[in-house]
Curated annotation (Swiss-Prot):
Listed NCBIfam families: PRK05474.1, xylose_isom_A
Residues involved in Mg(2+) 1 binding: E231, E267, D295, D338
Protein name according to UniProt: Xylose isomerase
Catalytic activity from the UniProt record: alpha-D-xylose = alpha-D-xylulofuranose
UniProt lineage: Bacteria, Pseudomonadati, Pseudomonadota, Alphaproteobacteria, Hyphomicrobiales
Source species: Brucella suis biovar 1 (strain 1330)
């Protein structure tokens, strides 16, 4: 039954590249076959509950701009929000959604009330998933908004906060498992510091390692089959976060023996904040064997903030999905739109239009990436660039020769290598040809 929030808008359909209907897909065709698989199954789109239904349109200089009928801290408002959210999911046709506990329930007086509220909403979600066919990509706990977490959750100097956070995560993993969630995410927005003057780095890292170990232990205890994911971000809201980027997270996982238990959920905007490209973070995660899922958005390249806009850069998406395809595609992960409307975008249809544009952009990127992969457009030049390592001398360098033996061969054979072109402009033109 319609809530009336979206008026008379009908389910979004694929109408093809020539369509000028802003409420139709021009490039995302869920059933189109790409590399032998349906486009929907490649992209595995998800809607973020927090930005789409919980964000009020505020910024550091001004408060709420959105006027939503569910904006109150009451359980009935949370139920209305759920009705609107699942109506939106059905209109858009994305197969998945994601949520934090605080997105979907009111803030209770204590842990017990929070848990009761969460379970009440999960009851509703279970029914709505059965009715609509929607699935949960991942669940997570909000361990950063409430003032109790101002000095962190897992890394808080107060053990009571650590305990409250751990108990909250336990309830959120339970909810995720109950809803058939395919992953569970941890984002350490307050796991870091503002100043080293009041921070014990060694203690805080050990506490974070202990916290994550508890999560992994509980996952196995209850038989949760999903993937545990960490989402890297260098700063904001803290000055420095411990899960700075993919490389930092991998080092952390190795230190605490969790590299085979936990993967990463990589956000485009967080990669940019860390001084990396999106494809760099994806390529490194793939190389290190910890690629899990992505949060799709974009940052404003001038402001330096994590602006969480909808993606609109097809060449960037092509290079990103090229890395996803090289990784073998998503398994339990997917493409979650961690993107929000601009605070002046007040109309209900703006929420659909933002997601439609993002899904079309990703579809174009996926198709370009698939063509590059099929044609060997980038892999063939790469193979040529490293061909010398496939020869007899290259293999001996990697698996037998000592340093003094190498020096002897260089002198005996008068090895005097000359540089070869990296052909960057040629490769960039290849990408432009496909997009």
């Amino acid at each position: 039954m319609s809530t009336g929030f979206f008026g008379d808008i009908q389910k979004v359909r694929y109408e093809g590249p020539e369509s000028d209907n802003p409420l139709a897909f021009r490039h995302y065709n869920a059933d189109e076959i790409v590399l032998g698989k349906r486009m929907e199954d490649h992209l595995r789109f998800a809607v973020a509950y927090w930005h789409s239904f919980a964000w009020e349109g505020g910024d550091p200089f001004g408060g709420r701009t959105f006027d939503r009928p569910w904006f109150s801290n009451e359980i009935d408002a949370a139920k209305l929000k759920a009705d609107v959210a699942f109506e939106f999911f059905s209109l858009l046709g994305a197969p998945y959604y994601c949520f934090h506990d605080a997105d979907v329930r009111p803030e209770g007086r204590n842990f017990a009330e929070n848990t009761r509220y969460l379970n009440e909403i999960v009851d509703i979600f279970e029914k709505k998933q059965a009715e609509t066919g929607m699935k949960l990509l991942w669940g997570t706990a909000n361990l950063f908004s409430n003032r109790r977490y101002m000095a962190g959750a897992a890394t808080n100097p107060d053990p009571d906060v650590f305990a409250f956070a751990a108990a909250t995560v336990k309830t959120c993993i339970d909810a995720t498992k109950r809803l058939g969630g395919e992953n569970y995410v941890l984002w350490g927005g307050r796991e870091g510091y503002e100043t080293l003057l009041n921070t014990d780095l060694s203690r805080e890292l050990d506490h974070m390692g202990r916290f994550l170990s508890l999560v992994v232990e509980y996952k196995h205890k209850i038989g949760f089959k999903g993937t545990i994911l960490i989402e890297p971000k260098p700063q904001e809201p803290t000055k420095h976060q411990y899960d700075y980027d993919v490389a930092t997270v991998y080092g952390f996982l190795k230190r605490y023996g969790l590299e085979n238990e936990v993967k990463v959920n990589i956000e485009q905007g967080h990669a940019i904040l860390a001084g990396h490209s999106f494809e760099h973070e994806l390529a490194l995660a793939r190389t290190l064997g910890i690629f899990g899922s992505i949060d799709m958005n974009r940052n404003d390249y001038q402001s330096g903030w994590d602006t969480d806009q909808f993606p609109n850069n097809v060449p960037e998406m092509a290079l990103a999905y090229y890395q996803v395809l090289l990784a073998g595609g998503f398994t339990t992960g997917g493409t979650n739109f961690d993107a929000k409307l601009r605070r002046q975008s007040l109309d209900s249809q703006d929420l659909l239009i933002g997601h439609i544009g993002g899904m079309d952009c990703c579809a174009r990127g996926l198709k370009a990436a698939a063509r590059m992969l099929e044609d060997g457009a980038l892999s063939k030049p790469l193979d040529e660039r490293y061909a010398g390592w496939n020869g007899e001398f290259g293999k001996r360098l990697l698996s037998g020769l000592s340093l003094d033996q190498i020096a002897g061969e260089v002198e005996a054979k008068d090895i005097n290598p000359q540089p070869k072109s990296g052909r960057q402009e040629y490769l960039e033109n290849i990408v432009n040809h496909y997009v």
